Structure formats: structure tokens, C-alpha cells
Amino acid sequence: MRSSLLANNGELIANGLLDRIMRSINAFGLTHATMDIREHSEVHHKLLNQVLGGSSAEILTKQLLEKSTPVLKDLDSSSDNCFKTFEAIKELIDRFGPEVIESYIISMTKSANDVMAAVVIAKMAGLISLQDANSFAKIGFVPLLETVAELRSADKILDELLSDKNYRKIVDLRGGIQEVMLGYSDSNKDAGITTSQWEIHKAQRKLRDVAIKHSVKLRLFHGRGGSVGRGGGPTYDALIALPWGSIDGQIKMTEQG
């Protein structure tokens, strides 16, 4: 269209409104906003306990590599809603493209197993396949570290995840990027604002080192905003206070409305 306008004395339109539209699409895409989906880790384990009879690492690994999908029946309301959420994610991605939903956040992540539980449910819903002939990962998985104890275990959780060859394959299918969300509110309620900020700072450095060890790009998602106790304050000051190397070309932050 632009070439046609330029060839037919339409420079004002081609270099004006049309050019601005093209630049906007290049920058932001055609999707209004990419959504994140978030669920508590215990909900995933509850669903898997009903379907598989457990959610240990051995059970999850076996199910992740199974070609067949177990029959999901007689689920309680919360487990049924959880699985329907994954099915809805697949439907939206298939209809509108991969930009509509990119990240699935697991709140109250205490171990790598909490993330793998969500991965297995995603596999059941058709969002993940690790079969060599047709491997794909339509969404990425984001551990949310909220309490001081989880922040102090951040490096161990991420290292265990990335050391799992099946999970690492998912990361590679997603462009070699691992996102981790850091919670400001719960850690502040746990130990106060000073300890919370210091533990978040240390967690970022440890996560950075683990990402370098495994040769993946780290994208930190800061769940900050609102009051000072929830990490609020000027964004510029927050950015320049981040540890060296923790921004690997990408960063995410919540913006309170």
C-alpha cells in the first residue's frame, strides 16, 4: 500500500498516517495487550492428585513424556476450573496467535516441582508437547517467589528447574528465555520493608548467576507498585537500583492502576 501511494503522488498519506500506523504495528504488534495467567501452586497439585493420584517428581516426569492423556473426570469445582483455564488458553492462542498469552505464573512457588505440576497440566491441555517429532511449547512458565524463604531459595529453585532436561527443552522452545516473578508484598509482610528489599536484591543476583550458568536469558518480572511497602516508588529509581546484569535486555513490571 505504501509503495503504491508513493508511486501515485500519495507521499503525504504514505509518510504521514500510514507510516505512523506501520511503526506502531512494528513496535506493538496487532494485539492490544498480551495477558498473563496466574494461579496458586496448590491448585495444580490438587488437580493432579485427583487425576494421577499424586504429583511427585517421578509421577510428573512420567506423565510429561506419555503420548496419551489421562481421562479427566469427577473433578471438584476448583480443579475443573483450573483445567478449563488451560483449555481456554489453548483456544485463545489457536484463535488469535501466540502473542495473546505468553506467560503462566505459578504463585507461591516453593520448589521446582510446583512449576512442573503446571507444565504437566499444560501438556494435558495440548499446550506442551515434548515428542521429538513434534515438540512445541505454546506458553512459558513463570515461578512467582513471594515470601522471604522462597526468595532465599531462588537460586536453588531455578537451578533445579533448568537442570531438568525436559523443562530445559521447554525453555529452548520458548527462545531460551526464563522469566521469574518477584513478589514485593508478601515478603514485606513477612519481614518488613528493609529485609524484603534486601532479600529481593540478593535473589536477583543469585538468579542472574544461575541463568549465566545455564546459558539462558533471564527476564525478571517485578510485582511492584502502589505503596512503598509493595515496592512502589519512581520507576526510574527502581531501575537504576537493580543489580548489575539482572536486566538481560528485558524486564517486566506491574503498573498499578
Question: What is the predicted role of each segment?
Answer:
Residues 16-19, 80, 84, 113-116, ...:
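Generic alpha-helical secondary structure signal
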Residues 14, 33-36, 42-45, 114-116, ...:
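Short helix/loop capping segments that flank catalytic or ligand/cofactor-binding pockets
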Residues 58-63, 68-119, 128-142:
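C-terminal amphipathic alpha-helical interaction region
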Residues 125-257:
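Catalytic or ion-translocation cores adjacent to nucleophile or general acid/base/metal-coordination motifs
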Residues 8-11, 75-79, 104, 108-111, ...:
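Hydrophobic alpha-helical scaffolding
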